[in-house]
Swiss-Prot record:
This is WW domain-binding protein 4. A zinc finger (Matrin-type) spans 11-42. Residues 114-123 have a biased composition (Basic residues). Its main location: nucleus. The gene is Wbp4. Residues 219-272 have a biased composition (Basic and acidic residues). It comes from Mus musculus. Signal peptide: none annotated. Pfam families: WW, zf-U1. Residues 357-375 are annotated as: Interaction with SNRNP200. SMART domains: WW, ZnF_U1. Keywords: Metal-binding, mRNA processing, mRNA splicing, Nucleus, Phosphoprotein, Repeat, Spliceosome, Zinc, Zinc-finger. Involved in pre-mRNA splicing as a component of the spliceosome. May play a role in cross-intron bridging of U1 and U2 snRNPs in the mammalian A complex.
């Protein structure tokens, strides 16, 4: 049997980046060495530092996300308040998820947190929070100093402040034709359909629901206009009321011809005796069934003839600089070719016909071909 050589097994030390013999005495001897211990301690410190940095980054990111959520929630609540929409009950303040860190907090940071808590309690005790009621009847709390709002009752809230009632944004109104529309007092928007967040009040219904009659005459419209003007003056004087009055907005002004037509109709109605209430009730729905176009009526556009006025463009004068094509064509110069006649042909004149001579070739080769020189 032939002899063969077998190598000893090797082991790679990840801390020292070197190869050692894979046996127990060699491994123990290497691990007891000073260089190996220093490398192990250095690796442990690096891992610890990386974990701390990662924890700090996660904490910073969580704080940034919480701040973004708080800002978005605040803007959303402000939009709801501006539009007069009820605040949903499932909205809660964003909470920062705690991040576990191996660094122990210093006593100075604890003192700062305690000071901040005391300041918040003092601000709450001073009466910065105000209790309000939404359109749905839910209570919320609003901070006049910081502008924050929350559903939970804050600490130190006294409860002796005035409650701020949410105002109804949409108001019901009547057009000149007797149709009901809805007007937004904040944005100025008007629509025919009843909005979802419309809040009916006792003072809103002023037309057909209370009196049972539509403003068919101009006198009723004028009285309603004066009534709305007096209400506007009362609001400006400071007599705030939670009930919003119905507004009557004129979409278009009537011409004098329509006013003249309405005049004799009013006189006829006054002169004629009152009919049975059943007949009047039958006539009212007919007037309401009048077809209305929310986009307005078609108008014919008349194109006005534009007056062609000569406008001075202050261009430079072009007199004598360029000629028109017609003038250039007329003034073209004609080229005259001269004819020359040959009187005599030399030898041919003496009665001898001309002879064409051939070229002489040197050594039987044409002259125009390149000849090889002596050097080549």
């Amino acid at each position: 049997m032939a002899d063969y050589w077998k190598s000893q097994p090797k082991k790679f030390c990840d801390y020292c980046k070197c190869w050692i013999a894979d046996n127990r005495p060699s491994v123990e001897f290497h691990e007891r060495g000073k260089n190996h211990k220093e490398n192990v301690a250095r690796r442990i410190s690096e891992i610890k530092q990386k974990s701390l940095d990662k924890a700090k980054e996660e904490e910073k990111a969580s704080k940034e996300f919480a701040a973004m959520e708080a800002a978005a929630l605040k803007a959303y609540q402000e939009d709801l308040k501006r539009l007069g929409l009820p605040l949903p009950s499932d909205i809660s303040e964003p909470t920062v998820s705690p991040v576990i860190s191996t660094v122990q907090p210093t006593p100075t940071s604890n003192q700062q947190k305690e000071k901040k808590k005391k300041k918040k309690k003092k601000e709450a005790s001073k009466g910065g929070w105000v209790e309000g009621v939404t359109a749905d009847g839910h209570c919320y709390y609003y901070d006049l100093i910081t502008g924050a709002s929350q559903w939970e009752k804050p600490e130190g809230f006294q409860g002796n402040l005035k409650k701020t009632a949410a105002k109804a944004v949409w108001v019901e109104g009547l057009s000149e034709d007797g149709y009901t529309y809805y007007y937004n007092t904040e944005t100025g928007e008007s629509k025919w359909e009843k909005p979802e967040d419309f809040i009916p009040h006792g003072g809103d219904v002023l037309s057909s629901k209370d009196s049972g009659k539509l403003p068919d005459t101009l006198e009723d419209a004028k009285s309603s206009d004066s009534h709305s003007d007096s209400e506007g003056e009362q609001k400006k004087a400071g007599e705030a009321s939670t009930e919003t009055k119905k507004l009557i907005i004129k979409f278009k002004e009537k011409n004098k011809s329509t006013e003249k037509r309405i005049g004799p109709e009013i006189q006829k109605e006054k002169s004629t005796p009152k009919q049975n209430p059943s007949n009047t009730n039958e006539e009212k729905p007919k007037t309401l069934k009048k077809s209305t176009n929310p986009y307005g009526e078609w108008q014919e556009i008349k194109q006005e003839a534009e007056s062609q006025e000569e406008v001075d463009l202050e261009l430079p004068s072009t007199e004598g600089e360029c000629l028109s094509t017609s003038e250039a064509g007329v003034g073209e110069i004609k080229v005259v070719f001269k004819e020359k006649t040959v009187s005599s042909l030399g030898v041919a004149a003496d009665g001898v016909a001309p002879v064409f001579k051939k070229r002489r070739l040197e050594n039987g080769k044409s002259r125009n071909l390149r000849q090889r020189g002596d050097d080549e």
